[in-house]
Amino acid sequence: MKIMQSVTQLREALAGQTSVGFIPTMGFLHEGHASLLEQARQENDIVVLSIFVNPTQFGPNEDLDRYPRDEQRDQQLAQAAGVDYLFYPTNDVMYPLDMARVTVRSGDDVLCGTSRPGHFDGVLTVVSKLFNIVQPTRAYFGLKDAQQLALIEGYVTDYFVPVEIKRCPIIREADGLAKSSRNVYLSETERKQAPGIQQALQQAKQALDAGTPLETVLEQTRASLHFEGTTIDYVEAVAYPTLGPVDATTDTILLAVAVQFESARLIDNLLYTRGA
């Protein structure tokens, strides 16, 4: 595995490669990232992993400065997963002039976009830059960040980016908690409460299977997510991947939640296909 910070150096290394699988991350890697790397390794000749804590996707009161970092551990996991090139750009590399950014026109007015204004502009800006640098054949994203994934798919379509976006399943702890770099923030009590998010989503699925109206399911889910010391950011259902309102013609529904614990904000979701 080679570690690089230079755009020119990485482009030269990738020139002429038949297929390149790419996983963009902010580091502090876990088993969820490892599953993306494993799939990329199986499907491509070359695997590129980027680690960059992107400042433009953090709001003024968010956790940019304390976002967990562990370069040595990340490098070990990347090496074990068979990564060929680990791209470690600096802010100056990624934002040399910072004169232009991507702006999201739709799909950021629901779910995380409501409480994190500008977040997805930052995400799509950095993803756009990384796609231009790496020029991958395939890029891998986890469904845990389902809204982000849908917006990236939309960006790729709107901008005619020649990359195949691969949706990858959510990887969970044994008790159902979705793997996340931010789980490390949780106190012991919060860690015991957190699996209740997935439990609430599974109860919602069972209710939908039984024919319970969607609005009733959302109300029931909100009621089941009232953990001590937490606030509910949202419990919403949107059509997927359009992120528009659910109506009678909607085949796939994204049921998504965000819960603010004292130590961390956790998100989770499920995709529900009507009639499946």
From Swiss-Prot:
Gene Ontology MF terms in the entry: ATP binding; pantoate-beta-alanine ligase activity
Active site: 33 (proton donor)
Xref: InterPro entries: Cyt_trans-like, Pantoate_ligase, Pantoate_ligase_C, Rossmann-like_a/b/a_fold
Gene3D superfamilies for this protein: HUPs, Pantoate-beta-alanine ligase, C-terminal domain
Cellular compartment(s): Cytoplasm
Metabolic or biological pathway, per its Swiss-Prot or TrEMBL entry: Cofactor biosynthesis; (R)-pantothenate biosynthesis; (R)-pantothenate from (R)-pantoate and beta-alanine: step 1/1
Known catalytic reactions: (R)-pantoate + beta-alanine + ATP = (R)-pantothenate + AMP + diphosphate + H(+)
Protein residues bound to beta-alanine: 57
EC number: 6.3.2.1
Binding annotation for ATP: 26-33, 142-145, 171, 179-182
Top EC category: ligase
Entry binding sites for (R)-pantoate: 57, 148
GO biological process: pantothenate biosynthetic process
A GO cellular-component term linked to this record: cytosol
Keywords assigned: ATP-binding, Cytoplasm, Ligase, Nucleotide-binding, Pantothenate biosynthesis
SUPFAM superfamilies per record: Nucleotidylyl transferase
Family the UniProt entry places it in: Belongs to the pantothenate synthetase family.
Binding partners and assembly: Homodimer.
Role this protein plays: Catalyzes the condensation of pantoate with beta-alanine in an ATP-dependent reaction via a pantoyl-adenylate intermediate.
Misc. remarks from the entry: The reaction proceeds by a bi uni uni bi ping pong mechanism.
Protein name according to UniProt: Pantothenate synthetase
Organism (species): Exiguobacterium sibiricum (strain DSM 17290 / CCUG 55495 / CIP 109462 / JCM 13490 / 255-15)
Gene: panC
